[in-house]
């Protein structure tokens, strides 16, 4: 019986693909070597310890229907589209060794005619007339008895969109999360015009087989049928939840300020695990009572635009004469935290 397992996903859903990855990783035998190939439609993928409000332009993502997905490995934020090929290598310990999986990817690129090399802790670069350019980034996860190495290869990604979603709004965030380091990147199509996702997957697969001296049939994972993986439904529900993708953000503080015709407002939030743990409101409004009441209501509230808007509008019952001001405030807060 082969020790290899090859899985290829037909889904472009990042939550689906990351749930598949997690389920395979948790239940794989210690003697198995796994290669999982996949890609995501428009998504910002953040590291396990990152703060999405700091890393991403969450408002622009919402406008453009770009998903946010938190992965279980560390590292920085990346933008995925269908111009990226994603790979995951898994193995039990002590065999797990990220230098092996890195060499498999380098061998695959070499077979395609691209000479690349490892750079730093987790990048693959090619040499160009303008200097080294990154074509692949990776992240890693290890438990007591197993490990995985996953990464992306830039085939024909829309690099102009990176800045749309990975450059955050100028929010006044004093965050404790890990800030992504931006690198100069290039697409493989600059070196191999017309290269496709299927060709890259085939090259990685062949390099994987060659390294281990075995072949195995690919298992196609399709969103049309629930994968036959232990606890997949629960894992997918968690991976796609607001609580995981946003609520797992490290503790941070957020300062919002705005001047309205009726006065200036300054809001100070402390946020932990996606909930407001402290809210302070400062204003020079001639009628500060609704704002003072709002500070109390926001304590414990989810740091989510619709929930904050709901708390603002709930004050209309007690302060009907301030309806105009409260609706302006509600719209501003909801827009500011998206």
Curated annotation (Swiss-Prot):
Pathway: Protein modification; protein lipoylation via exogenous pathway; protein N(6)-(lipoyl)lysine from lipoate: step 1/2; Protein modification; protein lipoylation via exogenous pathway; protein N(6)-(lipoyl)lysine from lipoate: step 2/2. Its main location: cytoplasm. Pfam families: Lip_prot_lig_C, LplA-B_cat. GO terms for molecular function: ATP binding; lipoate-protein ligase activity; lipoyltransferase activity. Residues 29-216 form the BPL/LPL catalytic domain. It catalyses: L-lysyl-[lipoyl-carrier protein] + (R)-lipoate + ATP = N(6)-[(R)-lipoyl]-L-lysyl-[lipoyl-carrier protein] + AMP + diphosphate + H(+). GO terms for cellular component: cytosol. The keyword Cytoplasm applies. GO terms for biological process: protein modification process. CDD domains: BPL_LplA_LipB (cd16435). Its EC number is 6.3.1.20. Keywords: ATP-binding, Cytoplasm, Ligase, Nucleotide-binding. (R)-lipoate binds at residue 134. InterPro entries: aa-tRNA-synth_II/BPL/LPL, BPL_LPL_catalytic, Lipoate_ligase_A, Lipoate_protein_ligase_C, LipoylTrfase_LipoateP_Ligase. It is found in: Cytoplasm. The keyword Ligase applies. PANTHER family: LIPOATE-PROTEIN LIGASE, LIPOYLTRANSFERASE 1, MITOCHONDRIAL. In the transfer reaction, the free carboxyl group of lipoic acid is attached via an amide linkage to the epsilon-amino group of a specific lysine residue of lipoyl domains of lipoate-dependent enzymes. Monomer. Catalyzes both the ATP-dependent activation of exogenously supplied lipoate to lipoyl-AMP and the transfer of the activated lipoyl onto the lipoyl domains of lipoate-dependent enzymes. Belongs to the LplA family. This is Lipoate-protein ligase A.
